[in-house]
């Protein structure tokens, strides 16, 4: 990072568009997903941070309080996959976004979904503001797994990503993980982000790791949405196979989504429902860290990923990792855990058994993981990203 980067960033007025929902209650802003906490920290490096996204009219709070952050609401629609709702919301959204640009220097537009992302990017250029694109996922791959058989959505995703990649040749892009960096390698300028919510104080030392792999129970932990692209039903199969070899295994699942009932049914079908606890969504500061500390392994079975935040959290907790080799996962996990093919319960169960039985391998992996996560703390990632967003001095 340039020596003057922090000073430069401190005078930048930054707006961020992301296709997330927010709620406002009693004058306070609440965010739907923990990525917003990363954005909140990014605001510490700017003169002004303004978030813009869907205002959910449903009463109640989302889990994450966004203190000290300005908010410009956009019309609500249920999902970027519901194109009619997206298009109905677009005229009012365009007018609101145009007004937002009046007192802004830099705009980070995360996309390529929904279509508004591309429109907002073009409006930013028309208003002669600095535009930086942001990409967190392989959209066509995500749509293929989340909406199987819906070819029109997959084609729309291909078109949106193609337009984003074409625009990226003219403007800088910040992507999550090396896999997406490869897809956007022809961008005018490229920065790789690791979305981390970890402070240095969260990273355990070897002396603080008191896990007992000879205990009466072994707990595997899964953290993530229970949606098709995350492949949560495989967790039941992994648990069943692992328990055949070692009856001590139990499963903790943190996350909610469309496949929760299907996962419960699959656990019953395999006769392992009494070995599993489905906790629902557990906020970062609402008990999730304790579950990392109490677990013996993290199991991550997604079909598609950028760089999962949960892997960094497991690294910080010195929790051994078994993960599918998809997206940006191999680059992050290399030397820090075991990789398995997607949708292969036998391979995942075998990897769990290998790690339980090899103390030296576990120690090497968690030591490497601890060193790696120190490179990607929340403060470090936000400093680097803020400097990139601000642009050349």
Map each language-model feature to its residues:
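Aromatic "clamp/platform" in nucleotide-sugar-dependent glycosyltransferases that forms part
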Residues: 303
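A short, active-site helix/loop in glycosyltransferases that binds the activated sugar's phosphate group
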Residues: 54-55, 157-207
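Short acidic/histidine- and often glycine-rich active-site loop of Leloir-type glycosyltransferases
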Residues: 326-339
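Short hydrophobic beta-strand element within catalytic cores of glycosyltransferases
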Residues: 311, 320-323
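Nucleotide-activated donor-binding/catalytic signature segment of Leloir-type glycosyltransferases, i.e.
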Residues: 264-282
């Amino acid at each position: 990072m340039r020596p003057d980067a922090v000073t430069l960033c401190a005078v930048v007025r930054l707006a961020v568009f992301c296709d997330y929902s927010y709620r406002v209650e009693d004058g306070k802003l609440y965010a739907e997903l923990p990525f917003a906490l990363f954005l909140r920290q990014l605001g510490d490096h700017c003169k002004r941070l303004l978030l813009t996204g869907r205002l959910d009219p449903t009463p109640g709070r989302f889990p994450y309080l966004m203190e000290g952050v300005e908010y410009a609401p956009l019309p609500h629609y249920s999902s970027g996959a519901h194109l009619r709702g997206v298009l109905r919301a677009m005229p009012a959204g365009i007018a609101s976004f145009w007004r937002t640009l009046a007192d802004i220097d830099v705009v980070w537009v995360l996309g390529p979904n929904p279509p508004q992302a591309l429109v907002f990017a073009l409006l930013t250029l028309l208003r002669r503001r600095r535009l930086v694109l942001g990409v967190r996922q392989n959209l066509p791959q995500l749509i293929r797994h989340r909406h199987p058989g819906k070819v029109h959505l997959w084609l729309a995703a291909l078109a949106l990503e193609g337009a984003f990649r074409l625009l990226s040749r003219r403007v800088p892009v910040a992507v999550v993980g090396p896999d997406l960096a490869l897809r956007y390698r022809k961008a005018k300028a490229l920065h790789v982000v690791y979305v981390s919510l970890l402070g240095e104080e969260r990273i355990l030392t070897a002396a603080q790791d008191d896990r007992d792999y000879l205990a009466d129970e072994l707990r595997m932990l899964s953290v993530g949405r229970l949606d098709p692209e995350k492949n949560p039903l495989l967790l039941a199969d992994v648990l069943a196979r692992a328990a055949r070899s070692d009856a001590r295994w139990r499963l903790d699942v943190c996350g909610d989504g469309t496949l929760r009932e299907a996962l419960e049914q699959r656990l019953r079908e395999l006769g392992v429902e009494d070995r599993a606890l489905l906790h629902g969504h557990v906020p970062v500061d609402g008990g999730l860290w304790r579950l990392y500390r109490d677990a013996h392994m993290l199991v991550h079975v997604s079909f598609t990923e950028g760089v999962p935040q949960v892997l960094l959290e497991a690294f910080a907790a010195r929790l051994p990792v078994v993960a599918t080799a998809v997206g940006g996962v191999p680059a992050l996990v290399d030397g820090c855990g075991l990789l398995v093919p997607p949708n292969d319960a036998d391979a995942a169960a075998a990897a769990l058994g290998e790690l339980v039985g090899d103390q030296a391998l576990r120690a090497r992996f968690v030591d490497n993981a601890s060193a790696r996560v120190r490179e990607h703390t929340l403060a470090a990632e936000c400093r680097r990203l803020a400097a990139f967003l601000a642009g050349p001095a």
